[in-house]
């Protein structure tokens, strides 16, 4: 039994590459996206923060949540926090929109120059995209791995309305059926 499952479909990963990308480079790009996803989740609880997120926060958002979605976004320039938030909620890792999510956890990572207004702007982009009564938990961390002037936002959205849960579940089950049929042919 699981509380939540994050689905990262291969065909969505393929949408991040050009047609001319070699298979070797395509797998490297896809591997990097998956690595960032895993790092994004582990960084939420292991990286000391200005505003900390801990395992209890993740449990609060993920427990009995069903399907969950995850996105990561990077931003630079004048609107870097808003751009990172928009990129995270429209990430190639997201099978469907985060609209309607009733559980949201997000982390804003930046350097010493990250401002409270940027945190507020990013939070506004994310909170306006989910259920108005959603349980929202966020944290902020200082990340030395980021380039100067860069902001990184990791979003996990869960507890979707039943119609969205069914859509995500059916997408996952359809993939399993295709994979099972392919295995039977070998």
Predicted feature residues:
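Tubulin/FtsZ superfamily GTPase core signature
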Residues: 1-186
């Amino acid at each position: 039994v699981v509380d939540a499952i994050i689905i990262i479909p291969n065909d969505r990963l393929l949408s991040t590459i050009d047609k001319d990308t070699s298979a070797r480079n395509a797998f490297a790009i896809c591997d990097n996206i998956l690595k960032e996803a895993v790092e994004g989740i582990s960084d939420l609880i292991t990286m000391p923060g200005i505003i900390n997120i801990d395992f209890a926060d993740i449990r609060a958002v993920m427990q009995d949540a069903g399907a969950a979605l995850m996105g990561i976004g990077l931003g630079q320039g004048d609107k870097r926090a808003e751009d990172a938030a928009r990129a995270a909620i429209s990430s190639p890792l997201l099978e469907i929109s985060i609209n309607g999510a009733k559980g949201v956890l997000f982390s804003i990572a930046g350097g010493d120059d990250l401002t409270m207004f940027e945190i507020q702007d990013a939070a506004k982009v994310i909170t306006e995209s989910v259920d108005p009564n959603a349980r929202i938990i966020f944290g902020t961390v200082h990340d030395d791995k980021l380039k100067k002037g860069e902001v990184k936002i990791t979003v996990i959205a869960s507890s979707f309305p039943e119609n969205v849960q069914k859509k995500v579940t059916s997408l996952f089950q359809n993939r399993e059926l295709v994979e099972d049929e392919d295995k039977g042919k070998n």
